[in-house]
Amino acid sequence: MNPASVPPALPPPGQQVIHVTQDLDTDLEALFNSVMNPKPSSWRKKILPESFFKEPDSGSHSRQSSTDSSGGHAGPRLAGGAQHVRSHSSPASLQLGPGAGAAGSPAQQHAHLRQQSYDVTDELPLPPGWEMTFTATGQRYFLNHIEKITTWQDPRKAMNQSLNPMNLHPAATSTPASQRSMAVSQPNLVMNHQHQQQMAPTNLSQQNHPTQNPPAGLMSMPNALTTQQQQQQKLRLQRIQMERERIRMRQEELMRQEAALCRQLPMEAETLATVQAAVNPPAMTPDMRSITNNSSDPFLNGGPYHSREQSTDSGLGLGCYSVPTTPEDFLSNVDEMDTGENAGQTPMNINPQQTRFPDFLDCLPGTNVDLGTLESEDLIPLFNDVESALNKSEPFLTWL
C-alpha cells in the first residue's frame, strides 16, 4: 500500500500538524509553469450565457439600421419591433424622418408635439445671413454665415421678442450657450459643418429642404428692423425732452424761491454790503446778519427763519450798553500819557466792540493806564468821572 495514497488522519482539536512534502521542487515548478505558460482553455468551460454562443440572425441591432436614425430609409427591423436604445438618448428622437411620419405609431406621433409648438415662427422669414438645415436624423439646426456659428435655437424667436415693446433687449446671450451645448452633444456635426464651410459653399444648396432658399419676403426684414429702431429712438427722444422740461421747471422754481427770499429780507443789498464790510463775520449768512444788526424784534420782520437773538437783559450781550460817557478831557489826558511809537495806531487796531464796554475802567488798577505815573492833581478829575459814571440815574447793567 502506498503511504502517499493514505489520507492523513485528522489532528485532534487544538493541535497543529505540519506536513513535509518530499517532492517540493517538482510542485513549485508546476506552479510556475501554470502561471508563466498558461494553456488556452475552451469557451465552453467558462460560465457564459447561452446567447453568447449563438450567432446573430441579422445586423438589425447596428446604429445605422435603427428606425429613428435612418434618415427616412426603411431599414430591417426585428420581429418583436424592438428599437435601438442609443437612438432615444439623442435629440434625433424628438423628430422623425420624412419617410417615417406617415407610418408612425400614436406614441411616435406624440413626440412631434414639442416641434409643433414652435410652428408659429415657421411663417416668418429667417434673418439675413441665417440658414436652416437638417441633420441625417431629421433634426433641424440653424447656420449663421455672418458670425460663423451653428445653433439649435431658432433666431426668429429672438426677433419676435425684440419686436415686443416690453422686451426691447432680446436675450442674445443664449446663443453661445446653445452653441456649446450643440458642440458637446454632437461634435461630429459641428466639425462637419466647419469642414463644409472651408471646402465649398456650393454644398449648402444641395439640401432638399424648401426653406433653404431665402424667400422673397426676406428683403423686407431690414425695413422692419429700421422701423423698430426708429420707434425706439423716438421713445428715447421723448424721454430726454421730458427730462429737460422737468429740469427747466425746477430751475424756474428755484429762481422764484430765491426772489421770494430776497423780498423777505428787511434790509437793502447796499446796507448788507456795508454791514458785511464792517463786521465781516466768516460764517454768517445774510439773513443772520440782518437779524443780528437790527435792534427790533426779528419776529416782526416776517422772515421764515429763526436764529439765536442777542440778549438785551444781561451784561453778556453786545447791544446792552448805552452811549459811552467818557468825557473829552479824559481822552485827551490819555493821549498825552501814551508815549509809544504806535500810540496813535492802537485805538484804530482794536475792535470797537471790545473798547466800548470798559470805558470807565481804563483808569482803574489792572487796566492799560498806569496809575503810578500820574500826579495827585491828575487823579482827582478821574475819580470824579468814575463817581459820576457809577451814580447815574439810568444804569446800563441789569442784574438778574
From Swiss-Prot:
The gene is WWTR1. This is WW domain-containing transcription regulator protein 1. InterPro entries: WW_dom (IPR001202), WW_dom_sf (IPR036020), YAP1 (IPR051583). Residues 124-157 form the WW domain. Residues 91-110 have a biased composition (Low complexity). Residues 52-117, 192-216 are annotated as: Disordered. The lineage of its organism: Eukaryota, Metazoa, Chordata, Craniata, Vertebrata. A motif (PDZ-binding) lies at residues 394-400. There is a cross-link at K46 (Glycyl lysine isopeptide (Lys-Gly) (interchain with G-Cter in ubiquitin)). Phosphorylated by LATS2 and STK3/MST2. Phosphorylation by LATS2 results in creation of 14-3-3 binding sites, retention in the cytoplasm, and functional inactivation. Phosphorylation results in the inhibition of transcriptional coactivation through YWHAZ-mediated nuclear export. Ubiquitinated at Lys-46; leading to proteasomal degradation. Deubiquitinated and stabilized by UCHL1 at Lys-46; leading to inhibition of osteoclastogenesis. Binds to SLC9A3R2 via the PDZ motif at the plasma membrane. Binds to YWHAZ in vivo and in vitro through the phosphoserine-binding motif RSHSSP. Interacts (via coiled-coil domain) with SMAD2 (via MH1 domain), SMAD3 and SMAD4. Interacts with MED15. Interacts with PAX8 and NKX2-1. Interacts with TEAD1, TEAD2, TEAD3 and TEAD4. Interacts (via WW domain) with PALS1. Interacts with LATS1. Interacts with YAP1 (when phosphorylated at 'Ser-112'). Interacts (via WW domain) with PRRG4 (via cytoplasmic domain). The modification Phosphoserine is found at S62, S89, S295, S311. The PDZ-binding motif is essential for stimulated gene transcription. It localizes the protein into both punctate nuclear foci and plasma membrane-associated complexes. Binds to transcription factors via its WW domain. Transcriptional coactivator which acts as a downstream regulatory target in the Hippo signaling pathway that plays a pivotal role in organ size control and tumor suppression by restricting proliferation and promoting apoptosis. The core of this pathway is composed of a kinase cascade wherein STK3/MST2 and STK4/MST1, in complex with its regulatory protein SAV1, phosphorylates and activates LATS1/2 in complex with its regulatory protein MOB1, which in turn phosphorylates and inactivates YAP1 oncoprotein and WWTR1/TAZ. WWTR1 enhances PAX8 and NKX2-1/TTF1-dependent gene activation. The keyword Ubl conjugation applies. Keywords: Activator, Cell junction, Cell membrane, Cytoplasm, Isopeptide bond, Membrane, Nucleus, Phosphoprotein, Tight junction, Ubl conjugation. It holds the Pfam family WW. It comes from the Eukaryota. Residues 222-400 are annotated as: Required for interaction with PALS1. GO terms for biological process: cilium assembly; glomerulus development; heart process; hippo signaling; kidney morphogenesis; mesenchymal cell differentiation; multicellular organism growth; negative regulation of canonical Wnt signaling pathway. PROSITE patterns: WW_DOMAIN_1, WW_DOMAIN_2. Residues 61-70, 192-211 have a biased composition (Polar residues). It is found in: Cytoplasm; Nucleus; Cell membrane; Cell junction, Tight junction. GO terms for molecular function: protein homodimerization activity; transcription coactivator activity; transcription corepressor activity. CDD domains: WW (cd00201). GO terms for cellular component: bicellular tight junction; cytosol; nuclear body; nucleus; plasma membrane; tight junction; transcription regulator complex.
